[in-house]
């Protein structure tokens, strides 16, 4: 049995299988998941687990070269945005797109991780980097 790292077997496998430029989405309660895209549903109840808790664990375990966020988070959820940006390494590039475009982009992710987050625009697409 694992003692450290990601203990959820679905999340661990997802992280282990990521290659350079592969993408994963961490989403709030309301983010729709396209047909055919795996959904790893971690939500227990409204707010649990939080977007930030899930993001923290994933950032500890995968190398991220780019993140994609909804432009709307800047005005609708600035506290979430500032906490999120504080966690990113300076080398991570940040792209803002419309929320509608971000939802379209989830059609090309390896999986959507659904959290219990209940604040607006708490969605992010993480693009995997490479360690060599």
UniProtKB/Swiss-Prot annotation:
GO-annotated cellular components: cytosol
Keywords: Carbohydrate metabolism, Cytoplasm, Isomerase
Residues engaged in binding substrate: 28, 99, 121-123
Catalytic reactions of this protein: beta-D-ribopyranose = beta-D-ribofuranose
Lineage top rank: taxon: Bacteria
Any Pfam family: RbsD_FucU
Pathway: Carbohydrate metabolism; D-ribose degradation; D-ribose 5-phosphate from beta-D-ribopyranose: step 1/2
Keyword Cytoplasm: yes
Single GO term (MF): monosaccharide binding
UniProt EC number: 5.4.99.62
Subcellular location: Cytoplasm
Active site (UniProt): 20
GO terms (BP aspect): D-ribose catabolic process
Alphabetized NCBIfam families for the sequence: PRK11797.1 (NF008761)
Function according to Swiss-Prot or TrEMBL: Catalyzes the interconversion of beta-pyran and beta-furan forms of D-ribose.
Quaternary data: Homodecamer.
Family (UniProt): Belongs to the RbsD / FucU family. RbsD subfamily.
This protein's name: D-ribose pyranase
Lineage, highest ranks first: Bacteria, Bacillati, Bacillota, Bacilli, Lactobacillales
């Amino acid at each position: 049995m694992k003692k450290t790292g990601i203990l959820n077997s679905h999340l661990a496998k997802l992280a282990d299988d990521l290659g350079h430029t592969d993408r994963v989405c961490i989403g709030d309660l309301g983010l729709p998941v396209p047909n055919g895209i795996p959904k790893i549903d971690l939500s227990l109840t409204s707010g649990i687990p939080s977007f930030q808790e899930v993001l923290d664990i994933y950032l500890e375990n995968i190398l991220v070269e780019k993140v994609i966020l909804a432009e709307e988070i800047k005005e609708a959820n600035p506290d979430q945005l500032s906490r999120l940006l504080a966690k990113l390494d300076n080398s991570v590039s940040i792209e803002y797109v419309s929320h509608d475009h971000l939802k379209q982009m989830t059609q090309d992710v390896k999986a959507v991780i659904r959290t219990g987050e209940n604040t607006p625009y708490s969605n992010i697409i993480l693009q995997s980097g490479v360690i060599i």
